[in-house]
Curated annotation (Swiss-Prot):
This protein's name: Calcium/calmodulin-dependent protein kinase type II
Modified residues (Phosphothreonine): T252
Post-translational modification remark: Autophosphorylated.
Any single Gene Ontology cellular-component annotation: division septum
Residues in Protein kinase domain copies: 65-351
Binding-site residues, ATP: L71, G72, D73, G74, A75, F76, S77, Q78, V79, K94
Cofactor: Mg(2+)
Length: 504
């Protein structure tokens, strides 16, 4: 039994049990609009993730919200699904334990809140309210009922080009608004930070799974402008890494008008193109099911990211259009001056849905189809039945404020993709700050976390630019600096199964 099969069973169980739980605890909110009554109801609600009743905490400052269930836990926070008495709709409430944070971390919360307040876009999670009490910060945000896009990639193994295009265009619309209207770069665009509003699932007629993926689920009928696979509107979340690169009032890079140094202007270009690089990673991951950069050794991984060493591996990319590969290549170009900006992105034929290839076709595929070829690394998308460890209760994520209702199994396959992507994204940010691959490897083990590296570089000169990293590096490095999760192609049962079918 594959990890994906086990994961799918878990999702089905979670969805059905959650439906029963929601039905059993539904409350007629029209009975009483009194604040005290809602406060009492909040204390009686239970966590929908398990059978055992767990009381949802009642926090000062949230009297206008009925807390319904705990969606997940973070390093300093908990996220709840709640009902807003004033708005008369469900919202997500992020409760941050202020008393556990130092000055820099508290500044980071205010920076994130201030950035979210200036962004209003249909593809960005909306911040409705911010409440500060003596011990807590409360962020009241738009609720994305579908959860993280990452879980849907795992659920469907990979997406069709139509669905991937539907998603990445919405991400790009949000990025364009951030860059051109708000003067903001996100700097942490990845599947875990892309949420979605669900749509009705419409099964395909006479669906036949791909020969190389006989267990691949049907993502359903694709409807232009609506979506497929239950995925509708996309929302970018988590602005903990984001940065203001120009002042909206002056429409210039941050600083006095006419006095911006060339390096400040260049920093705007480089910063924006970090988001474009991340979009390339997301598109690559959606189309094949694993990220473009991965390696067993952190130093080698850093080198691959910095030098743009990725491959369109066969057989995974055999049936994907050359036009899609060309777009990804332009997005993952090492030199940010040569990398596509957001306007070039929208002009690409693949984004427009055109069948023609670009005139200057640039991608150079590196295909390795046999285990006997050069050593490659690949996240283990499938594992044996004995390796599956499906938890009885939902596993809480510490990396994202708004969590999917899906429960994530503790398996090498899923966690490997999470970790590989997290390392690659953080390395790219550090490279933007001027670190070489050798420095990245050395400093990573000395400081113990990428968070500390970025914090040292960015907060020594600007307290307002504090960022919170969600990826502690010492979680992936052993005592000798070796990576404990396996990313070797030869050990991948996904690769083995596909190769066997090609031979037969």
């Amino acid at each position: 039994m594959s990890i994906l099969a086990g994961f799918k069973n878990l999702l089905k169980h979670s969805k059905s049990s959650k439906g029963r739980s929601n039905a059993s605890k539904s409350v007629d909110v029209s009975v009483n609009r009194d604040v005290a009554a809602y406060t009492e109801l909040a204390a009686k609600n239970v966590n929908a993730g398990g059978d055992e009743e767990i009381r949802v905490a009642n926090y000062p400052g949230l009297e206008k919200y009925q807390l319904i269930e705990n969606l997940g836990d973070g390093a300093f926070s908990q996220v709840y699904k709640a009902y807003s008495i004033d708005r008369k709709e469900h919202v997500a409430v992020k409760v941050i334990r202020k008393y556990e944070m130092n000055k820099k971390q508290r500044q980071g919360v205010f920076k994130e809140v201030n950035i979210m307040r200036r962004v209003k876009h249909k593809n960005v999670v909306n911040l409705f309210d911010f409440v500060e009490t003596e011990d807590f910060y409360h962020l009241v945000m738009e609720l994305a009922e579908g959860g993280e896009l990452f879980h849907q990639i795992v659920n469907f193994t990979y997406f069709s080009e139509n669905l991937a295009r539907h998603i990445i265009i919405q991400v790009a619309e949000a990025v364009k608004h951030l860059h051109d209207v708000c003067g903001i770069v996100h700097r942490d665009i990845k599947p875990e930070n892309l949420l979605f509003q669900p749509i009705e699932y419409l099964p395909s007629q006479n669906y036949t799974p791909p020969s190389l993926e006989p267990n691949k689920l049907d993502e359903g009928m694709f409807l232009e402008g609506i979506g497929a696979g239950g995925i509708g509107r996309i929302l970018i979340a988590d602005f903990g890494f984001s940065k203001v690169v120009w002042n909206s009032k002056t429409a210039t890079p941050c600083g006095t008008v006419g006095y911006a140094a060339p390096e400040i202007v260049n920093d705007e270009l480089y910063s924006k193109n970090v988001d474009m690089w991340a979009m390339g990673c997301v598109l690559h991951t959606m189309l094949c099911g694993f990220p473009p950069f991965f390696d067993e050794n952190i130093k080698d991984l850093a080198s691959k990211v910095v030098n743009g060493e990725f491959e369109f591996l066969s057989p995974w990319w055999d049936d994907i259009s050359d036009s899609a590969k060309d777009l990804i290549t332009h997005l993952l170009t090492v030199d940010p001056r040569e990398r596509y900006d957001i306007h070039q992105f929208f002009q690409h034929p693949w984004i427009k849905g055109e069948s023609k290839m670009p005139e200057n076709f640039t991608y150079k595929p590196k295909l390795h189809g046999t285990p006997g070829g050069p050593k490659l690394s690949l996240p283990r998308s499938l594992v044996s039945k004995g390796e599956i460890d499906i938890p009885t209760t939902p596993i809480k994520s510490a990396t994202h404020p708004l969590l999917s209702s899906y429960s994530e199994p503790k398996t090498p396959g899923v966690s490997s993709v999470h970790e590989a992507m997290g390392v690659a994204y953080d390395i790219r940010r550090l490279n933007h700050l001027g670190f070489s691959p050798e420095q990245l490897s050395k400093k990573s083990m000395n400081t113990g976390s990428i968070k500390e590296l970025i914090l040292d570089e960015e907060t020594t000169t600007d307290d307002d630019d504090y960022i919170i990293s969600s990826f502690p590096l010492n979680d992936t490095l052993g005592s000798e600096g070796k990576d404990p999760f396996s990313l070797n192609l030869k050990e991948s049962s996904l690769y083995s199964r596909r190769s066997a079918k090609r031979v037969n």
